[in-house]
Regions:
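A cross-family phosphate/adenosyl-ligand binding-site feature
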Residues: 1-119, 124-398
């Protein structure tokens, strides 16, 4: 997702410098062009050669390279950098950057950069919590830096507390959020529902469906990467929630109805991808229902229709998208649903089509709007999510 992007990775002199090598590796695996600058003290913990082998680029330390090209090296690098990430960042380098000191290759280059900047402090807990360090981090935030909070745990010095460098995969998510996709949803609020609901019969059993939640989670993640502020209301799933997304866990159809209704007004885009139960047991048994001879009939009652509620309580300018999984008459049923629910778009798929079933990482979707139907090919769910977001934005612009 980072093809064509250049990240300047600054590595400073702390024990966590070894993690920067793994970070460089995960960035390269995302097809990112990685340039590394180490401080002199960082070379006491890890060698420039390590980064050169991982990135395929020369790792820099000295400001004055005797083999420089006709361009001033730090200025040339600053011009081609899309994002700066200093990880790990010592208290010393945090102070330098906060006060504009430029006495080595790293600080000189960063001072010339006009791109987004991230910094991940990593140090002893006492150093991190020192008011001077906190003031310096606040100053960096004032100047537009995003400060990545350190993890807590046992530190190399033996102390326990905040100060650990987050794992490379976590740092990667910060980079992806900044660079992976254009931020065409910046300033927009997106509400997504995902997953199944569970309708309890007794303390042991419940009614549910096969929904994995993958489509809704993909929409939430892609909307986040495109700059939106995302709320994901999720039924029970085995999925890891997308980073930088507010997640509201629910269980039953009634739980989901209440969570959606409470948040509808603030949303600019709503994607109701959850497979919500249409019926719930009319009666709940406080004790386990015991097996008896003969058949058992369980009366069911209708749940509240969330999409119908959204369509009848929409505010001007709000774009609402529903989902429809069918086994027959997909177009006719989905077009009728579009009108009945008073929504802007229905994403329809047929369970019997290969690649469009439950639990898979692909989907075959038809986007149905008042203007017509657009059939999409077999796509990954993240690709399908982006096409759905594109269509929703086009509807908002009309």
């Amino acid at each position: 997702m980072l093809s064509g992007k250049t990240v300047l990775l600054g590595v400073t002199g702390g024990i966590a410098a070894y993690k920067a090598a793994a970070l460089a590796s995960v960035l390269v695996k995302q097809h990112c062009h990685v340039e590394v600058i180490l401080t002199e003290h960082a070379t006491q913990f890890i060698t420039p050669l390590t980064f050169e082998q991982l990135t395929g680029n020369r790792a820099m330390v000295d400001t004055f390279d005797r083999n420089f090209s006709h361009q001033v090296e730090h200025i040339a690098l600053a011009r081609r950098t899309d994002l700066v990430l200093v990880a790990p960042a010592t208290a010393n380098v945090c102070a330098k950057l906060a006060h504009g000191l430029a006495d080595d290759m790293l600080t000189t280059t960063i001072l010339a950069c006009r791109c987004p900047k991230l910094i991940a402090p990593a140090m002893n807990t006492g150093m991190f919590e020192n008011p001077v360090t906190q003031d310096n981090l606040d100053l960096l935030r004032k100047y537009g830096w995003e400060v990545i909070a350190p993890a807590s745990g046992r530190l190399a010095c033996g102390d326990v507390g905040a100060g650990k460098l987050p794992e490379p995969d976590i740092l990667l998510q910060y980079v992806l959020r900044r660079l992976a996709l254009p931020h065409d949803l910046e300033g927009r609020r997106v509400l997504v529902t995902a997953g199944p609901t569970q309708e309890p019969l007794d303390p042991v059993r419940y009614l549910t469906n096969h929904s994995s939640g993958k489509m809704g989670y993909a929409i939430a993640r892609m909307a986040m990467l495109r700059g939106a502020k995302v709320t994901l209301i999720s039924g029970p799933t085995a999925l890891t929630p997308p980073p930088f997304v507010e997640v509201v866990p629910v269980v039953s159809a009634q739980d989901m109805f209440e969570a959606v209704a409470a948040r509808q007004e603030q949303a600019d885009f709503i994607f109701k991808a959850a497979a919500v139960a249409d019926y719930t047991p009319a009666d709940y048994s406080d004790n386990k229902m015991k097996k008896k001879d003969g058949d058992l009939s369980i009366p069911l009652k209708r749940t509240q229709d969330i999409l119908q509620h959204l369509g009848s309580h929409r505010r001007p300018g709000q774009v609402i998208c529903g989902f429809s999984m069918e086994t027959q008459n997909m177009l006719e049923n989905s077009q009728a649903k579009l009108v009945k629910k008073n929504v802007d778009m229905i994403c329809a798929n047929n369970l019997k089509v290969a690649g469009a079933g439950f639990g898979v990482d692909t989907n075959v979707i038809t986007l149905i709007t008042p203007q017509g139907a657009e059939e999409l090919p077999l796509l990954s769910k993240e690709e399908a999510a982006n096409r759905i977001l594109d269509a929703a934005m086009a509807l908002a612009d009309r």
